[in-house]
Amino acid sequence: MQYTHPVLHMEKVCRSYKAKGIKRNVLSDLSLDIHPQEIVCLLGPNGAGKTTTVKIASTLLLPDSGTVEICGVDAVRQPRKACEHLSLLLGGEDGFYLSASAVDNLLFFAQVSGVPLIKQKALINEALVKVNLFEVRDQPVRTFSRGMRQRLHIARTLVAQNSLILLDEPTTGLDPESASGVRQLISELRHVPSGILLTTHTMREVELLADRVVVIQDGKSIFKGTLEEMRNSVEINHVSTYLAHAVSEDQIKKLKEQVGGSSVEVLDKCDSYYIDVAWTVSVPNELDERMFTWKKVNERNPSLEEVYLGLLSGRRKKDER
C-alpha cells in the first residue's frame, strides 16, 4: 500500500489529570500516524488511554505537550481549522436530533461540515443507500434501532467526506448481525479515501479491519505494526489444549509458575475442564507427567487475543523490546 503524508500525526503527546490533588498521567509520549486509505486499530485495556487519544485527535481535549496535526494543520493552535478535516463517531447511539428524520439530520450535518449545497442531496441519498437506510430516510431517528443509528453515523461520515475518521468502539452493544454490517461499512470507508483510527476490544474486528495496530498500556505505546508483525512479536510458540476431569488449585498454581499466569486459561464445562496453555521457547513445552495427568486434545497457533495478552504481560521477544 502506498502512503502519502499522514492525515493524523501525533508525536510525543502527553496528557494528565488531577484527581483529589493527585496527578495521574494518562498519556506519556504517545506517537502515531494515520495515512489515507488505511485503518489503524488502537488497542489497550480499560484505562490505557484509548478514548483520551481519540478525544485529543478530535480536538475535544488539549494535550499537555506534544504535536497533533490533522492534514498538516496544527490541531492545538488551530482546532477549528483542523476539525474541518475530521469526523468523529463515538460508541453509542447519541448525537442526532431524535424527532427529526434521517434525511434532515444528514442535511444539518452536511451544512455544518461545509458540504456545498449543490452536492448535499446527491451525497445524502448515496450515503443512505450504502448504509441500507434509504427506505426509512423520512422516519424520525427515535424509531431507529441502535444498529440503525450507528449506520446513520457512518452515513454522516460519508456525506462529510473528511480525510480523517475517528471511531471509538463503534460496534459496542450491537447484536452480531448489526456489528457485522457496521464492520463492512467501516471497511468500505477506505475508498472515500480516508484514514481511520478505530478503538475496539474485539479481536475479530481487528483481524477483519486493521492494516496496522497500535497497542497502548498505561498511556504508553508498547507495540506498533501489522498483524503479522504483532503475531511475531511475542514469545508464544503454540497453544496446547488439555482435557481433565479434575483440576486442583495447586496444579493451576504450579502451571502458572512454570509458564506465566496470563498463559493459562481454564474452562469449566460441568464434569470436565479444558485447559489452554500458551507455551514459549524459554520453558519446556510439555507438562510434568508426575503432576499432570491431563490428556492433550489439540495443538494450535496462538489466537490474536492470546498474542495481545502476551504483549500486555510483557512476553515480547527480546529483540523486539
Say what each PLM segment does.
Residues 44-49:
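Walker A (P-loop) phosphate-binding loop of ABC-type ATPase nucleotide-binding domains
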Residues 66-77, 81-82:
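Conserved ABC transporter NBD signature motif
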Residues 107, 111, 118-136:
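Conserved ABC ATPase "signature" region
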Residues 183-275:
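ABC transporter nucleotide-binding domain
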Residues 2-10, 16-29, 79:
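A short, flexible loop at the N-terminus of ABC-type nucleotide-binding domains that lies
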Residues 165-169:
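Catalytic Walker B motif of ABC-type/P-loop ATPase nucleotide-binding domains
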